[in-house]
Amino acid sequence: MICYKCGQDAGWNDKCPVCGADLSLFKRAIRISNSYYNDGLQKAQVRNLSGAIISLRQSLKFYKYNIQARNLLGLIYYEMGEMVDALSEWVISANYQPDDNLAKKYIDQIHNNRNQLETINQTIKKYNQALTYCKQDSKDLAVIQLRKVLSLNPKLVKGHQLLALLYLEEGHLDKAKKALRDAGKIDTDNTTTLRYLKEVNRRLKEKGTERKKKNDDLISYQSGNETIIMPKRFRESSMWANILLSLIHI
């Protein structure tokens, strides 16, 4: 345990052997931090990544030197396609604990892979361009740009979500649903994904109801070799007119 006052290793004592600071409350904060870390780990194991991020951030609020929590947070960001955020957490982790730290391995793996570095740069550039197109109401161009982003970085959850939102606004409900399902495969309980999916399903249900109503308003019958389709109201009106004519001739 690192003493909050002098920054030295204090073991697990109630008082720092170096500066004499009272560490009893500090130890409690560390225990709470570890509890949040365990919760985040459990959520990550079932791919509730957004929920895991919330728990791990809480863990680091109570104890910023929780290296395991910070490294796991970086891994989750990486899994969600947020490579810059992942690197940021690992750099902080490596600064807090330079020795015997997996964060340094993660950083080296990315820095030694030029293709991955280029992917990171292109992802940022193209995603920001897609946002610019959205602000300019150039939705078609934004969709094209987002497809390029996701071909480079298929795990970028926010890319799938933005693409789904654009499809939703354009009425392409099946495409929107597919984009949201792709996002859900990465992060199962993301509230934004679930909210968008609920709206897509609502609109699909309305569309299905309208189609059924439209079909119910049509009737078809065979006339020789031809199938005649006409509005039901027209048929009913014609029948009523024929009845009136027959009454007149009586």
Spell out what each predicted region is.
Residues I248-I250:
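Conserved small/polar residues in nucleotide/adenosyl-binding loops
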